[in-house]
UniProtKB/Swiss-Prot annotation:
Tissue: Expressed by the venom duct.
Family membership noted in the UniProt record: Belongs to the conotoxin O2 family.
Annotated GO MF terms: ion channel inhibitor activity; toxin activity
Chief location of this protein within or outside the cell: secreted
Disulfides per UniProt: 47-61, 54-65, 60-70
Protein name, as recorded: Gamma-conotoxin-like Am6.6
Function: Gamma-conotoxins may act on voltage-gated non-specific cation pacemaker channels (HCN).
Keyword Membrane: no
Residues cleaved off as propeptide: 20-45, 78-80
Organism lineage string: Eukaryota, Metazoa, Spiralia, Lophotrochozoa, Mollusca
Ligase listed as a keyword: no
Gene Ontology cellular component list: extracellular region
Taxonomic source organism: Conus amadis (Amadis cone)
Positions of modified residues (4-carboxyglutamate): 56, 59, 71
4-hydroxyproline sites (modified residues): 76
Length: 80
């Protein structure tokens, strides 16, 4: 009877350890997938909309500042 009790305790410990490891792996996957924030997240954090005043690219939701105003789309630079 004692051997059965010890065996059950060992089995319970092994199962709980396995469940804990599996939970940590799932959390790591969630963290990996949530690193890149969608553009909607950038709008909520306070970036400037199209045709709003800006000084640098990082201020605009489109990530494209044309010296004074945010552009709707990041156009390729033109060589003059």
């Amino acid at each position: 009877m004692e051997k059965l009790t010890i065996l059950l305790l060992v089995a319970a410990i092994l199962m709980s350890t396995q469940a804990l490891n599996q939970e940590q792996r799932q959390q790591a996957k969630i963290n990996l997938l949530s690193k890149k924030k969608p553009s909607a997240e950038r709008w909520r954090r306070g970036c400037t909309w199209w045709f709003g005043r800006c000084a640098e690219d990082g201020e605009c939701c489109s990530n494209s500042c044309d010296q004074t105003y945010c552009e709707l789309y990041a156009f390729p630079s033109r060589a003059i």
